[in-house]
Amino acid sequence: MFGDLWWLLILSLLVLSLVTRQGALILLTVLLALGAVLSWLSYRFGLYGVQYTRSLRDRRIFCDQETELAIEVTNAKPLPLAWLLVRDRFPRGLGLVVQDRIHGEDLETFPPELRELIVLRGHESARRTYRVRGYHRGVYTFGTATMASGALFGLQQKRETLEHLDYLTVYPKIVPVESLELSFERPAGTGRAQRRITEDPLRQAGVREYVPGDSVRHIHWKNTAHLGTLQTKLFDPQASEVVMLALDVQTTYDPYQAVPEYLELLISATASLAVDMLEQRQSTGLLVNSGPGDTEHWTHIAPSRHPEQGARLLEALAPLTGFRTLALSHLLYRSMHVLPYGSTVVVLTARTVEPVLLALLTLQRAGHPVVLLTVGDRQPWIPERFTTHHLGGRDAWHQLEGLALA
């Protein structure tokens, strides 16, 4: 409607200028007509030949690490672009570093988005770069983006939505294993001692008296016959054992509630142990009673020492939520048929309920050494037959948050 009135006004001025034969009025009419033509061309062909790309320097980063986000706009036609407004959705939970100040939750728009107003000549490109920091684990989605352009004075606009998405994975917080203070309670009240999680059954280090929970396969029958009491073999730690990390994402007895600090402590401890074990050349796998996006019943990554195993484990841990799809006890029972014989099972949980303890006892009787790592503001009571360590609760997580990466 406005366009018709505009052309009618120009036509009226043209007729008036010809009748009055005033040079200034004729010049004004020509300039207005030329501006109207350019404005119409800008509106009609503004987004034609305009290409928008978004790229991340890294697709996976560690917690507190930075990467670079770049957007590039190319005007592939000879007609200049008077103005182009780009709006690109920026994921909540990431930090946008501008002049060493981190933005993110305080971006002006909701939902947060990047905005750029760009002017381009024909066959010209413009590039903008941003520093992005991942300060919390997760899988973050960039997009969708919207481009708007139009008439010279913005009276008419055309918009185009770009559905292409990009994803950035932020790994869980990884801390030195020493900061977890893994001093384990030895079975049968033998006291606290620093020890590795796994033992090599091929390297015997000594003999001690048998206690309930010890594997029958490790009984030293010759010493048992000599002393008249059951004796168990002790083994040297060795980085060739198979370890399966079993993570319980349910942090309260109500499956529909959660304690975020417990969950982050459990996931950070799992990630830190996995990285440390792989560095020691231990074959390491993962079990979780949840899946990515809560779409799978449970997560299972077979033990491996492959160079890419660490990335597989960290990527599986990054998107986890506190919503479990399977009780931990059921997870342990279901996974028994996929556990390599004699592999050590390290269970990390905030709930040491009776079904879990019974499942651990079943694993022990099946020949799997079991290590239980617990989380909570109060240390739970655990039967002496289990090797256990309490990682702490909310305060422990807040302390780990401030530690440097391992």
Predicted segments, located by residue:
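Short, charged loop segments at secondary-structure junctions
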Residues: T295-L326
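Von Willebrand factor type A / integrin I
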Residues: M1-F45, G93, E315-A406
